[in-house]
């Protein structure tokens, strides 16, 4: 059985043929090695038992029932006194049946087969490493142009019968008609296997030939040479050089990744095809006793059928035309491609009911795949899920948690709090108080949540910002409230998206959440370093409306705040708040508090222009700006009115005070930014 504490991580990558055989092979007491699947059969139609050496063989994958072999004998599992561990008649091991969930097998392919993920996916890894056009490689692998030997090479390092010292071009006219006639003669396969390698075998030889460090060195040298040339003056040539440099960068990165992960390039060409454990591709019986099988079983059967058809002429002494052999190799290649990724080469393969087969790629990829739905999407303890809505009044590091979710997630902590405060004597009474929703329950819940962060996650978690920590607060309703600035990190929208909430239990997890995962500590993109918490959509519209003001300008609505001397004017009112308000003219205020107070009392509007007394800051004054109007008073003071500010000067032309022309929206926005900066400075000084 798999030890869950031993295997703490999962890594996906290429493996060597030796590793595949190590996963699958088992040695029986009689010395026989089992693990290779050679027959395309599943269950016997009469006995309903797995066929020997088939896709569900009990010798290869383990018993269907724990401790019971194919003969029906029983042994106690784990008893060291029980001997032998294998059945001497059928060769089935006496182990737990759960071994069929992870015990693998393999198919020994009669010819090398390229892995379609590395050949057809863009960018093509094989084409990048070999520096060959993808169409040329496809023509070689799938024999689209028969016989395509433009990439064939001698197997032996020394000259052979054909005096081939390297690859030769099929396009040469002298070869064009003689090669097809020669390679369709009897005994071609024996001669071909001795002289040259073709198809996927040729690609495998090419991938195994160069050293990865040599590839990196040559690519780096060529990239530097192209960079030193500079512009040629020809736009088409410059684009060609740019594409070549981009290709060299991709090739260099690929070679470095292969070196770092200890992956050999020739592993991209398969000689052994792993067979999934039977429990991951089951055959079940539905109503009426009709069997229903996974599509992968049918695709495996197709591979085995075609592989056995190719193995027969290669292992026997019968002479087979080379064209027939290469055609059968193409069928094996296409069968393996369909198993790994159905439809990657065009039209997908369908069954008799015109239904597309689900290949291995279809099983693992997408929202309903093995990883996102079965492994990452499974329910866990101390977690909840709900729709997210905007919480504009929240701080960046806070989230609003519905009471219904919060009381379930923190129920154990609330129970402990009720017992510690002697409100409940045992767990049962504490649970009853929680069900009755007594006021003391919410008070204890508030205390528990105050120092306990929660983790919010939105699938798919494609980067580290897909899961962040927040300080929860209780909110009404059934939706999770979220600050709009953290939306981009989750790649979420407030149009019905759902997010999961998790409670970190251990002290280590809580410390990691507080120190590394809080949203206000992840303001920059981890990939490119750009700010990721930036206002978008509704926030930009709100800021625009808040700061748009009255765009008519002072010339359109001319006002002098000091020119109101008629106390009997019915349009003018003066109160004790140190501001003068005129219904027809722009009011002026001594402080921002007075302006906001007037707005709350609905005496002015959000975008109404006003004059606000400002500190004597020379940065407000433009040195070259000419006043629109200058007004003098009998006392000798005068007022210089500009487009966006007003200066009151004394007789000696000294600045007495400055008024700026603004709106309540601008004042509110400025105060919010100022408070945020001051709070950040205090937090920074406290941390240092």
UniProtKB/Swiss-Prot annotation:
Any GO BP annotation: DNA-templated transcription
Cofactor(s) listed: Mg(2+); Zn(2+)
One Pfam assignment: RNA_pol_Rpb1_1
GO CC annotation terms, alphabetical: chloroplast; DNA-directed RNA polymerase complex; mitochondrion
InterPro entries, per the entry: DNA-dir_RpoC_beta_prime, RNA_pol_asu, RNA_pol_N, RNA_pol_Rpb1_1, RNA_pol_Rpb1_3_sf, RNA_pol_Rpb1_clamp_domain, RNApol_RpoC1
This protein's UniProt keywords: Chloroplast, DNA-directed RNA polymerase, Magnesium, Metal-binding, Nucleotidyltransferase, Plastid, Transcription, Transferase, Zinc
Domain of life of the native organism: Eukaryota
Binding site for Mg(2+): 493, 495, 497
Broad enzyme group: transferase
Subcellular location: Plastid, Chloroplast
GO molecular function, one term: DNA binding
Cofactor binding notes: Binds 1 Mg(2+) ion per subunit. Binds 1 Zn(2+) ion per subunit.
Residues where Zn(2+) binds: 69, 71, 87, 90
Catalyzed reactions: RNA(n) + a ribonucleoside 5'-triphosphate = RNA(n+1) + diphosphate
Key word Cytoplasm present: no
Coiled-coil residue spans: none
EC number of the protein: 2.7.7.6
Purpose: DNA-dependent RNA polymerase catalyzes the transcription of DNA into RNA using the four ribonucleoside triphosphates as substrates.
Family: Belongs to the RNA polymerase beta' chain family. RpoC1 subfamily.
Quaternary data: In plastids the minimal PEP RNA polymerase catalytic core is composed of four subunits: alpha, beta, beta', and beta''. When a (nuclear-encoded) sigma factor is associated with the core the holoenzyme is formed, which can initiate transcription.
The protein, known as: DNA-directed RNA polymerase subunit beta'
Name of the coding gene: rpoC1
